[in-house]
UniProtKB/Swiss-Prot annotation:
SUPFAM superfamilies recorded: ClpP/crotonase
Broadest EC class assigned to this enzyme: lyase
Origin organism lineage: Bacteria, Pseudomonadati, Pseudomonadota, Betaproteobacteria, Rhodocyclales
GO biological process: fatty acid beta-oxidation; toluene catabolic process
Protein name: (E)-benzylidenesuccinyl-CoA hydratase
InterPro entries named in the record: ClpP/crotonase-like_dom_sf, Enoyl-CoA_hyd/isom_CS, Enoyl-CoA_hydra/iso, Enoyl-CoA_hydra_C
Organism expressing this protein natively: Thauera aromatica
Length: 256
């Protein structure tokens, strides 16, 4: 299958499985990915997702231009009916971790930018190279990259199509960790299991406060956080958390 899904211990492991094509996205893999994100978003057993690419060379290099058919209708009809094919389906309050195991280029970097936590192997490369093929980083790249790293660096990448290394990505704050390729999967699993062991509603509310709050004035963001704290106050999981703390045991959260 061009995209695989494995669920273990409340973690969804999503793998782009076209290593022979640098894990680029053709119509079939795009459709698979859309279905998988719908499952991740709605399955109550899944609390966090890890996205990576198969093999050791590439996370994702965006659209497979060799397998992308020419458009059969005007842009307006396609956009107004379907919108974007992938990123809207990643919009959820469950966290998504990108384990970037090689090239994250074009749409591949844009997908990584839509994730909440990005970790990388030492051989990873990052770039939005669309200007080199007379295109534009239209999924989210022109907007998300300048918000993720310093403006000057983002503009250099966008306008020249130059790539940066994993070490540079770490220095600019595009990723939180860089490890040897052999250690990447274990690090992703460690972070995912830590998140999955926390109270699901608390994790989702925390993500919501952080994501929505950054577009609010500070005072409004703080007030919104207070509101979410109140929403969580009477949950069964919060009661369980306090009880487990008093009994010196691990809490058994249920997402209720």
């Amino acid at each position: 299958m061009p995209v695989t899904l494995e669920v273990s211990n409340h973690v969804a492991y999503v793998t782009l499985n076209r290593p022979e094509a640098m894990n680029s996205l053709d119509p079939e893999s795009t459709a698979d990915l859309t279905e998988i994100w719908a499952r991740v978003r709605t399955d109550p057993d899944i609390r966090v997702a890890v996205l990576t690419g198969a093999g050791e060379k590439s996370f994702c290099t965006g659209t497979d231009m060799k397998k992308s058919p020419p458009p059969t209708e005007c842009m307006a009809a396609t956009y107004l009916r379907d919108g974007q094919p992938i990123l809207p389906h990643m919009k959820m309050w469950k966290p998504i971790i990108a384990a970037i195991n090689g090239y994250a280029v074009g749409g591949g970097l844009e997908i990584a930018l839509a994730c909440d936590l990005r970790i990388a192997s030492t051989n990873a490369k990052f770039g939005l190279t669309e200007v080199k093929v007379a295109s534009l980083a239209g999924l989210n790249g022109t907007q998300a990259l300048p918000r993720a790293i310093p403006q000057a660096v983002a503009m250099k990448m966008l306008l020249t199509g130059e790539m940066i290394s994993a070490e540079e990505a770490l220095r600019y704050g595009l990723v939180s960790d860089v490890v040897e390729p052999s250690a990447l999967a274990d690090l992703a699993r460690s972070y995912a299991e830590k998140i999955a062991s926390a109270a699901p509603l608390s994790v989702q509310a925390t993500k919501q406060a952080a994501v929505l709050g950054k577009d609010m004035p500070l005072e409004h963001g703080i007030l919104y956080s207070h509101l979410l704290w109140g929403v969580l106050r009477d949950t069964e999981d919060r009661k369980e958390g306090f009880k487990a703390f008093g009994e010196r045991r691990a809490p058994a959260f249920r997402g209720a």
